[in-house]
Structure formats: structure tokens, C-alpha cells
């Protein structure tokens, strides 16, 4: 098999990474619709629409309407998340088998390392930009129901639309609300567009990304644990792109008799500055 053909086999797996991401990620449901964004500068920047309106004014029968402004501007934002990793797979007699090995490696890497980090970064980003952020040292048993209910009321009072609100909550909080009974908890959860249980390991107020070594992320020292996060989807800008895999065949590899595969992902996670009330954060204090 030619090197060109085998490289094509490896690259054929790249589009599948997008599908694997969507299935494994807890936050992919918040991805901004592709028709609402436009890429510039080699996909390093995105252009998103931003609408500004004015309220009603008096109408005078003699002079008519009071002038007002309605503007739709395009805001350019730079990608704020970019990560990568280079892998090596020993050269094999059957290069097609090497392609399958890469597919399995990439899939497992995405599920076990990439997706948890992407979710954690997004939660931390939205936490930092949340319009409302109460904190409790502890939450009493059966207290979660009241706290999430209060969050819903606060968002409604802030005139955040009740549709398209997504609840992200810890397993402890989810279980506590379920203890209210099947009927009551179902009615409660049905108020949300979706309810997602998030492992605490992805649910921090702030995270630190490792620059080298084993890579990955960790809770930033002093950052609180997130109890729950309610996101009105139109309030956030969430974009993710997978770079086509960089393939170096064994003949070109000067370090070893192995295939090298470069994986790279970049994206944008942000909250519209005029829609911060569309993100409600509740955290618990931690001691370290």
C-alpha cells in the first residue's frame, strides 16, 4: 500500500472525531448553530451577529413616532481555546491495520481526555461570566430542589426566556431532587430543555490547563466546586473545530520507525456581554 493511500486512510478518521465528540461531550448541546457564525483569518476568528434595540417611546398624533435605533452588528471574536498532542504508532507491515489502530487511539483519546477537558473548560468559562452566582458552604438534604427553583425564578425575573434553558447539575444534586418523588421531580425537570448530570471532576469554577508533560487539566487552587449551572443557550457562543490530522509516515519520521499523528483542536467559548443573566451559577466553597 502506498504512503499516500495509507495517509488517506488515517485522515478518513478525522471527520468521525466530530461525531464522537458530539456523542461524548456533555456540553455539545450548547454548540452555536453553524449558520450563525462565519470564520475569518484561517478559522482563528469567528464573526457572530449581535443585535441592539431600543424600547418603546411615546407616540404623538402630531409629530408621530420618536426616532429609535435598531442595529445588527457583526462582532469578531478570537478563538480562546487551542490544544494539541502528537502521537506515535509503530510501523506495521499492514498499513491498513495501522489506520485502524489510529482510529481506535483517536477515539479513546477523545472520549477519555479531550471531551472531559473541553467540558471542564467550558463550565469554568461560563462560570466566570455568569450573571448570577450565589455560593453555599453546604447544601442540606432536600435543599437542592429549593435552590434550583430559586435560580429559575431569578432568571425569569431577569427576563431570561424560559425556553431553551439547560440545567447542568452534580450527581448528588440530581439524586436529591429525584428523592422528591417520580412525578414531582419529572415535572420539575421538564421545565428545562435538557438536564445533564455532570461528574464533579469536570465541574469546577476555574481550571488550570497543563502546558506539557502528561497534559490535561486540574481544578485551579482555591476554585470552588460547581453545584449546578443553568445556561440559556442563546446567551453563549460555543464553537469547536478539529484540525485535519497531521500525518508523518515512517520514512519521513526522523525519530523512530513509526507513524506520527498530530491531533489539534481549537474553539471559542464565551457569553454575550448583554446576556450574562442567561447563565446562573451555584457553587460550594472549598478549603483548598
Walk through the language-model features, giving the residues of each.
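Structured, hydrophobic secondary-structure cores that serve as assembly/anchoring elements
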Residues: 47, 53, 66-67, 73-101, ...
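Short, Φ-rich (hydrophobic/aromatic) sequence segments
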Residues: 13-22, 147-151, 228-246
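Alpha-helical scaffold segments that mediate packing/assembly in large oligomeric complexes
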Residues: 93-160, 280-288
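Extended, compositionally biased alpha-helical segments that mediate assembly or anchoring
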Residues: 245-288
Amino acid at each position: 500500500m502506498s504512503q499516500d493511500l495509507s495517509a488517506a486512510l488515517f485522515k478518513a478518521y478525522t471527520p468521525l472525531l466530530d461525531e464522537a465528540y458530539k456523542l461524548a461531550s456533555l456540553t455539545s448541546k450548547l454548540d452555536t448553530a453553524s449558520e450563525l457564525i462565519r470564520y475569518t483569518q484561517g478559522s482563528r476568528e469567528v464573526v457572530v451577529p449581535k443585535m441592539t434595540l431600543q424600547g418603546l417611546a411615546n407616540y404623538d398624533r402630531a409629530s408621530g413616532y420618536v426616532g429609535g435605533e435598531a442595529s445588527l452588528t457583526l462582532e469578531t471574536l478570537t478563538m480562546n481555546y487551542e490544544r494539541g498532542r502528537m502521537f506515535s504508532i509503530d510501523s506495521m507491515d499492514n498499513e491498513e491495520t495501522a489506520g485502524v489502530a489510529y482510529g481506535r487511539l483517536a477515539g479513546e483519546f477523545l472520549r477519555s481526555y479531550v471531551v472531559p477537558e473541553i467540558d471542564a473548560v467550558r463550565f469554568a468559562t461560563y462560570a466566570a461570566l455568569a450573571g448570577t452566582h450565589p455560593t453555599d458552604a453546604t447544601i442540606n438534604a432536600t435543599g437542592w430542589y429549593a435552590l434550583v427553583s430559586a435560580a429559575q425564578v431569578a432568571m425569569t425575573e431577569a427576563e431570561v426566556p424560559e425556553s431553551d434553558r439547560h440545567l447542568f447539575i452534580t450527581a448528588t444534586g440530581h439524586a436529591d431532587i429525584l428523592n422528591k418523588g417520580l412525578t414531582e421531580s419529572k415535572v420539575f425537570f421538564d421545565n428545562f430543555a435538557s438536564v445533564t448530570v455532570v461528574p464533579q471532576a469536570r465541574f469546577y469554577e476555574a481550571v488550570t490547563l497543563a502546558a506539557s508533560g502528561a497534559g490535561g487539566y486540574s481544578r485551579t487552587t482555591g476554585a470552588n466546586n460547581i453545584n449546578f449551572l443553568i445556561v440559556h443557550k442563546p446567551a453563549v457562543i460555543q464553537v469547536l473545530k478539529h484540525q485535519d490530522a497531521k500525518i508523518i509516515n515512517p520514512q519521513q519520521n526522523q525519530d523512530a520507525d513509526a507513524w506520527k499523528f498530530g491531533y489539534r483542536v481549537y474553539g471559542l467559548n464565551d457569553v454575550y456581554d448583554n446576556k450574562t443573566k442567561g447563565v446562573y451559577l451555584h457553587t460550594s466553597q472549598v478549603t483548598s
